[in-house]
Curated annotation (Swiss-Prot):
Name of protein: Homoserine kinase
Pathway: Amino-acid biosynthesis; L-threonine biosynthesis; L-threonine from L-aspartate: step 4/5
Family statement drawn from the similarity comment of this UniProt entry: Belongs to the pseudomonas-type ThrB family.
UniProt-listed Pfam families: APH
UniProt keyword terms in alphabetical order: Amino-acid biosynthesis, ATP-binding, Kinase, Nucleotide-binding, Threonine biosynthesis, Transferase
UniProt cross-references to PANTHER family, sorted A to Z: AMINOGLYCOSIDE PHOSPHOTRANSFERASE DOMAIN-CONTAINING PROTEIN (PTHR21064:SF6), AMINOGLYCOSIDE PHOSPHOTRANSFERASE DOMAIN-CONTAINING PROTEIN-RELATED (PTHR21064)
BP GO terms, sorted: threonine biosynthetic process
InterPro entries cross-referenced by the UniProt entry: Aminoglycoside_PTrfase, Homoserine_kinase_II, Kinase-like_dom_sf, Pseudomonas-type_ThrB
UniProt catalytic activity: L-homoserine + ATP = O-phospho-L-homoserine + ADP + H(+)
Example of a GO MF term: homoserine kinase activity
């Protein structure tokens, strides 16, 4: 989450005039993440999150995201349900940009996830996959494997600027991933950005909720697990924590056992998931607005994860 769009008191009052939420009491920006502008709003009736959609958010995709959040909440999954205005609309406009209000969810993210957090996060991810079954809308993964080569072609010079020789290494990775990419795995709604800052825990350490579904799409469930392994199971020194990974997968399988094909696919999917986040971080590196309250994330963090996958895919003991 971040803040790229400033909102005046008058603009906020006019926006809230369409809702039955009372008057604004407090309103402040949330300076985390890199995608949208987010604000914590407190009114005389409760607390909410106002999101103004920026950057990659395509207006035509927003109904999918908001309807998905409503679907998940209505099916018992702890996600931030969008708030409808008096006319029943959840997708609104402020300062000429699409915007939405959602419920404020209690809980805290884990800044330094433990093995226990990983187990809980894994179970929460499986719960999400099951809760999304039957959601009628569809959205292709526009940051999935078929799009990576095209994305990289726009940023080859940026890669070389970060690390001489990196472009050739990435070209080789992309070719190998294209040849080995799994097909036909169990699929459905995935989060696709299930990072520690998008998962909340209760005070006792149990899973509380997931937020920030604005990369959600239809893809292989095991790919979502791979994204999550990369996000949760690498230590600050770049080493892979296999104990945390096994705990995460065990937590997942509390609710949804993996098929043999999914287990076998996790190593290549994890390599691909590292590629996806390397590429989007590379794209963000030179394009984050100068006045934003956020720094772009280091693409080389995910290049180092790619290096681990190149040399030691057996680290992913999904079946262990």
């Amino acid at each position: 989450m971040a803040v790229y769009t400033d909102i005046t008191d008058d603009e906020l009052a006019a926006f809230l005039g369409d809702y039955d939420l009372g008057q604004a009491v407090a309103f402040k920006g949330i300076a985390e993440g890199v995608e949208n502008s987010n604000f914590l709003l407190e009114t005389t009736t409760g607390r909410f999150i106002l999101t103004v959609y920026e950057r990659r958010a395509k207006p035509e995709d927003l109904p999918y995201f908001l309807d998905l959040l409503t679907w998940l909440a209505d099916h018992g999954y702890p996600s931030a349900k969008p708030i409808a205005d008096r006319s029943g609309a959840t997708l609104k406009t402020i300062r000429g940009k699409p915007a939405a209000l959602v419920e404020f969810l209690p809980g805290l993210s884990a800044r330094r996830p433990t093995v226990a957090h990983c187990r809980e996060a894994g179970e929460g991810l499986a719960w999400l996959h099951l809760a999304g079954e039957g959601y009628p809308a569809r959205r292709a993964n526009d940051l999935g494997q078929p799009h990576w080569a095209s994305l990289f072609s726009k940023h080859r010079k940026d890669a070389e600027g970060l690390k001489p020789g990196l472009a050739a290494t990435i070209d080789k990775d992309l070719a190998e991933l294209a040849l080995a990419w799994p097909r036909g795995l169990p699929s459905g709604v995935i989060h696709a950005d299930y990072f520690p800052d998008n998962v909340f825990f209760k005070p006792d350490g149990k899973f509380a909720a997931a937020i920030d579904f604005y990369f959600a799409c239809d893809d292989a469930y095991a790919y979502d697990i791979a994204v999550t392994l990369n996000a949760w199971c690498f230590e600050s020194d770049g080493s892979f924590n296999i104990t945390a990974a096994r705990a995460l997968i065990a937590g997942y399988e509390r609710r949804r056992p993996l098929s043999p094909a999914e287990r076998d696919a996790i190593p290549i999917l994890a390599r691909g998931a590292a590629m996806r986040f390397f590429l989007t971080r590379l794209a963000d590196w030179g394009s984050t607005p100068a006045g934003a309250l956020v720094r772009p994330k280091d693409p080389l963090e995910y290049e180092r994860k790619l290096a681990v996958h190149r040399e030691g895919l057996s680290l992913f003991g999904a079946g262990a």
